[in-house]
């Protein structure tokens, strides 16, 4: 029987628009989680250098967009290697969301899974940015469907399949079904800071609220039969001032932190931090009994015994689509 896997789910505030500062905080949280016995730590969507909340306050902000590009994180950069080194030093897997900067200076909502040995096991981009996010971020491609990897924790735990999706990717049935087919036992659902819904007359969508997004994560836990690490960020007055979101649809009040761990049947396993104060930082810890994933899938396996592939099936194109094609070869 598999042993338990101790996980850490951050509920923290980034150093807004500060690449070096957020990388330093990332490494500190990695060390803290390892000291508390965690073997895997999860970070939210666009953790580095923070989610660009101003996109929900005004249609364009050239100054902040430019600063955001300069402070976004590139795969293979010294900053990324610093995070890899922290994972290796503390022997902990890191599942992290970040604003990924391409060599052309385009940005993508990116995710990475780093092994306890410091190896990048998975790097992907959000397949389709949501609404106003498209003013900052580009689309992913076929290779970004590969979002579940084997993470070797060694010892009694051994290898565990770990996966991730970003934010409203949890609304997309086809993308979710493909991810289900990859068989993760632990899934990280990455979200930005989330506000409670303002009521029936509020112009914002309930499906974008703290309640709505947790509902999406819980639904994914039920559908997949996996543990879901529902990871959100915090935005205090410091973030509001940095992004000037006081009058925005989102990020207009301090808060955003609603991190928790969900069981493979959808139940919430952890209590809210700090009595439910969403403006306070912390780390949620949980010990995952991986045998419960197997037990749950005996009842519900949507890509196995509880499916009808003779009637319904999913077509997938995992090829990376290059921007320049030289004959049959994409550059």
UniProtKB/Swiss-Prot annotation:
InterPro entries: C-N_Hydrolase, C-N_Hydrolase_sf, Nitrilase/CN_hydratase_CS, Nitrilases_CHs
Cysteines engaged in disulfide bonds, as pairs: none
Keywords of the record: Hydrolase
Active-site annotation: 45, 126, 167
EC number assigned by the record: 3.5.5.1, 3.5.5.5
Any single Pfam family the record assigns to this protein: CN_hydrolase
GO molecular function, one term: arylacetonitrilase activity
Presence of the UniProt keyword Nucleotidyltransferase in the record: no
Enzyme class name: hydrolase
Reactions that this protein is recorded to catalyse: a nitrile + 2 H2O = a carboxylate + NH4(+); 4-chlorophenylacetonitrile + 2 H2O = 4-chlorophenylacetate + NH4(+)
Boundaries of every CN hydrolase domain copy: 5-290
Keyword Hydrolase applies: yes
Family statement: Belongs to the carbon-nitrogen hydrolase superfamily. Nitrilase family.
Record's protein name: Arylacetonitrilase
Species assigned in the record: Auricularia subglabra (strain TFB-10046 / SS5) (White-rot fungus)
Gene name tied to this protein: nit
């Amino acid at each position: 029987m598999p042993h338990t896997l101790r996980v850490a789910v951050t509920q923290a505030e980034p150093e807004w628009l500060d690449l070096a500062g957020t990388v330093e905080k990332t490494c500190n949280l990695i060390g803290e989680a390892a000291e508390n016995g965690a073997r895997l730590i999860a970070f939210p969507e666009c953790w580095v250098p923070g989610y660009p909340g101003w996109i929900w306050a005004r249609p364009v902000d050239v100054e902040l967009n430019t600063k955001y590009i300069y402070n976004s994180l590139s795969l293979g950069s010294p900053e990324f290697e610093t995070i890899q080194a922290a994972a290796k030093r503390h022997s902990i897997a890191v599942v992290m969301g970040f604003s990924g900067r391409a060599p052309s200076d385009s940005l993508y909502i990116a995710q990475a899974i780093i092994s306890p040995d410091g190896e990048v096991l998975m790097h992907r981009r959000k397949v389709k940015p949501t609404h106003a996010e498209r003013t900052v971020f580009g689309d992913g491609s076929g290779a970004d469907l590969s979002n579940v990897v084997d993470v070797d924790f060694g010892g009694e735990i051994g290898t565990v399949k770990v996966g991730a999706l970003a934010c409203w990717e949890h609304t997309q049935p086809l993308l979710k079904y493909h991810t289900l087919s990859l068989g993760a036992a632990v899934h990280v659902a990455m979200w930005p800071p989330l506000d409670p819904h303002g009521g029936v007359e509020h112009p914002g969508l309930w499906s974008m609220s703290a309640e709505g997004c947790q509902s999406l994560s819980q639904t994914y836990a039920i559908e997949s039969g996996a543990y879901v690490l529902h990871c959100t960020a915090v935005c205090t007055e410091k973030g509001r001032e940095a992004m000037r979101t006081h009058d925005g649809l989102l990020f207009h009040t301090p808060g955003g932190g609603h991190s928790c761990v969900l069981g493979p049947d959808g139940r919430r396993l952890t209590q809210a931090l700090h009595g439910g104060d969403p403006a306070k930082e912390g780390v949620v810890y949980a010990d995952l009994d991986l045998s419960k994933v197997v037990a749950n899938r005996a009842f519900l396996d949507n890509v196995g015994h509880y499916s009808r592939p003779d009637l319904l099936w999913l077509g997938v194109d995992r090829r990376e689509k290059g921007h320049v094609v030289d004959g049959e070869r994409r550059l």
